[in-house]
C-alpha cells in the first residue's frame, strides 16, 4: 500500500506538468491585415478537450474570443463573429485562430486554454500567451 502511494506521489505531478499549450504567431501585423495564430498542445488529445482562445488588451480585462469543441464545431463571441475563424488539426495537435481586418484595438496578449469535454470546470491548462501588436 505504501509503495503504491509513493509512486503516485512521485509520478502524479509530472503527468500534470506534461499537459501544455503553446501559442505562436507573427508578433506584429499591420492594420487591415489578417492574423493567424497557432496553439500547439501536448499531453492530451484534442478529441477529448475543448480549446478556447482568449485575449487581454493592454491594461484591460480578459476577453473571450471563441472555442473549438471536440467535434470541430465552434462558438465565437458575437462581437468577433464576422472576423474570426477557429479550426484545428487533431493529428498535429494544433488549434488555429484566424482573425481578419486587424485593427489597432486588436493589440493584445492572446492565450489558448482548455477544458475537458463534458465538464463545467475552470480552464484546466493555459498557454504562456503570445503578444500581438497591430501597428502600421
UniProtKB/Swiss-Prot annotation:
**InterPro entries associated with the record:** Ig-like_dom, Ig-like_dom_sf, Ig-like_fold, Ig_sub, Ig_V-set, IgHV
What would be one Gene Ontology cellular-component term for the protein? immunoglobulin complex
Q: Which Pfam family is one of this chain's hits?
A: V-set
Residue ranges of the Ig-like domain?
19-128
Q: What GO biological process term is on the record, naming one?
A: immunoglobulin mediated immune response
Q: Which UniProt keywords apply?
A: Adaptive immunity, Immunity, Immunoglobulin, Signal
Its signal peptide is 1-18
Q: Which domain of life is it from?
A: Eukaryota
From the Swiss-Prot or TrEMBL record, what is one GO molecular function term? Answer: antigen binding
Name this protein carries in UniProt: Ig heavy chain V region XIG8
